[in-house]
Amino acid sequence: MNRIEGHLLAADLRFAIVSTRWNHLIVDRLVEGAELAFVQHGGKSENLDHFIVPGSHELPLVARRLAETGKYDAVVCLGAVIRGDTDHYKFVAGGAASGILNSALHTGVPIAFGVLTTETVEQALNRAGIKAGNKGAEATLAMIETVNLLRQIR
């Protein structure tokens, strides 16, 4: 049996990051982690474009448009949705997740769901690099690997 995996080399890749302005103190850390992961794996910062949207609800549409341009090998969506006292959290997080997945499937371009969905601000900060790694970096690494795997399949 042949085992085929993507490698973590971003030297010739061009990525778009789409991040939310909402919860920017958390999201800014995710963006920093994403950029660092891209560069540490051979990517050039000039091959990384950063787009900012108001909130997580806007991520899927902008990600899809970016994917459709053909300029990007992958799109990394970053945000933070923190549970509050109403059901708003469920609709925003669920809508963003399904919209991002549908955008990737529709365009054939890998699009990462790097949106934190947490109960508290503390949990979100931990996942943005304080204690539990940086989920922005993890989303970027997943896209580097996925793009390189897809190149082997074509």
Curated annotation (Swiss-Prot):
(2S)-2-hydroxy-3-oxobutyl phosphate binds at residues 85-86, 127. GO terms for molecular function: 6,7-dimethyl-8-ribityllumazine synthase activity. Its EC number is 2.5.1.78. Belongs to the DMRL synthase family. GO terms for biological process: riboflavin biosynthetic process. Pathway: Cofactor biosynthesis; riboflavin biosynthesis; riboflavin from 2-hydroxy-3-oxobutyl phosphate and 5-amino-6-(D-ribitylamino)uracil: step 1/2. It catalyses: (2S)-2-hydroxy-3-oxobutyl phosphate + 5-amino-6-(D-ribitylamino)uracil = 6,7-dimethyl-8-(1-D-ribityl)lumazine + phosphate + 2 H2O + H(+). Catalyzes the formation of 6,7-dimethyl-8-ribityllumazine by condensation of 5-amino-6-(D-ribitylamino)uracil with 3,4-dihydroxy-2-butanone 4-phosphate. This is the penultimate step in the biosynthesis of riboflavin. This is 6,7-dimethyl-8-ribityllumazine synthase. It comes from the Bacteria. Pfam families: DMRL_synthase. InterPro entries: LS, LS/RS, LS/RS_sf. It is an enzyme of class 2 (transferase). The gene is ribH. One of its GO terms (cellular component) is riboflavin synthase complex. Keywords: Riboflavin biosynthesis, Transferase.
